[in-house]
Amino acid sequence: MQLKQVIIAYKARDSQSKRWAELCAKQLENRNCQVLMGPSGPKDNPYPVFLASASQPIDLAIVLGGDGTVLTSARHLAPAGIPILGVNVGGHLGFLTESVDEFQDTEKVWDRLFEDRYAIQRRMMLQAAVYEGHRTNLEPVTERYLGLNEFCVKPASADRMITSILEMEIDGEVVDQYVGDGLIISTPTGSTGYTVSASGPIMHDGMEAITITPICPMSLSSRPLILPAGSVVSIWPLGDYDLSTKLWMDGVLATSIWPAHRVDIRMADCRAKFIVLRENNSYYQTLREKLLWAGTRVRYTSTQHN
């Protein structure tokens, strides 16, 4: 990999990730690399400025923070095909990041990148758009939204706990009306997030599929569904026209929707690209460690049962 121009985004208002960012920037500049650096957080979005001010194609984005910081980077950088090296500095679980232990010798990391001694993992994303009008003559009313983990459709009210009524179509065919607290439409990457908390299935992150998980449905027959990646999921909010429903992307508010609006969610035409430094990268080891499964209490090797 050539590193002529690099983005470094660090978790906003986190001194540890900022110190790492400054160290990385200094080392890369000493290797004749142009660096664009800035904070990323709920009130800080550096990516439009990064992309607009780049003097040449961006070769890599180094993202220092937790999963939320990495999710933000993926939504902005995936359409441009920019690979992301996420490092868990100041984060929590770190499902999407390299351990900071892999990043201690940063000069060695740069050597590995220059010498192409790494792997690239491509992860499926979802895109959503909102339409209004008659079913046969719908007009778009929003931009395209991207999500790496999931989209969530939930009712919204400042002073009431509202039960939502959501009609769902798959590939133009009405499947069900869900009465409950909302729906989660997830990628395999997102299946270990909000989806698993709502009793949805865990899908291997190397798959391409879409899962739909009802949130606290009032019908016991409302169960999670796993769909082919090429499916189009359409959701119509029904009920009170005075109450809005919110569309969330990776835990961030995308927009408000109302009865007579339709949300179409499908596989995006871009993938999030992640740099993997771990030489023995195991999805199941990640599950054991991050979800604290029984396997984390046993020192396990691949030859243990031989």
Curated annotation (Swiss-Prot):
GO terms for cellular component: cytoplasm. Pfam families: NAD_kinase, NAD_kinase_C. The active site is at residue 67. It is found in: Cytoplasm. Keywords: ATP-binding, Cytoplasm, Kinase, NAD, NADP, Nucleotide-binding, Transferase. NAD(+) binds at residues 67-68, 149-150, 181, 192-197. It catalyses: NAD(+) + ATP = ADP + NADP(+) + H(+). Its EC number is 2.7.1.23. It is an enzyme of class 2 (transferase). One of its GO terms (biological process) is NAD metabolic process. The keyword Nucleotide-binding applies. One of its GO terms (molecular function) is NAD binding. Involved in the regulation of the intracellular balance of NAD and NADP, and is a key enzyme in the biosynthesis of NADP. Catalyzes specifically the phosphorylation on 2'-hydroxyl of the adenosine moiety of NAD to yield NADP. NCBIfam families: PRK02645.1. HAMAP family: NAD_kinase (MF_00361). Belongs to the NAD kinase family. This is NAD kinase 1. The gene is nadK1.
